[in-house]
Amino acid sequence: MQNTLEKQKIQSRRQIYPSLSMRIDRLDRMLDMMLEYQTQIPEALSEDFGHRPEMLTKFAELAATFDSIHFIKKNLKSWMKPERRKATPPFNLFGAKAYIQYQPVGVVGIISPWNYPFNLTFGPLAVVLAALTISPVVVVIPDESICVTCD
């Protein structure tokens, strides 16, 4: 685990500041993956839980995650805009302008729980992929009790 984390830290330092189109592409690929496996995901979760109603999984896991991703995509452009601030003296006397430009740093870890593993993994993952202040490098650690879902 420590070795993987160290490799991810090195990789995060090499990452460029992700553009809007790169972030949207990552979110679109996540949506495509979810749509491609939308029948297998409820089956895997049902097998992990012994029995879990398909509609529960579709609403609580898939639909909630879809909504999160669509909300992020809708607002991402405005979230990425630099925030204007007042320049401090003496710089403001010379017409200086100040902005805050959020940039990703570091590595994010997501440890997913057993009860709603898909939504509580991919919901935060979508936020991380689009986020302004955290890294596009993520280490996901799923709960051991959902081994079929992880496959």
Please provide the spans of the model-predicted regions.
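Rossmann-like NAD(P) dinucleotide-binding subdomain of oxidoreductase/dehydrogenase enzymes
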Residues: 88-151
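N-terminal Rossmann-like NAD(P)+-binding subdomain of aldehyde/semialdehyde dehydrogenases
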Residues: 1-97
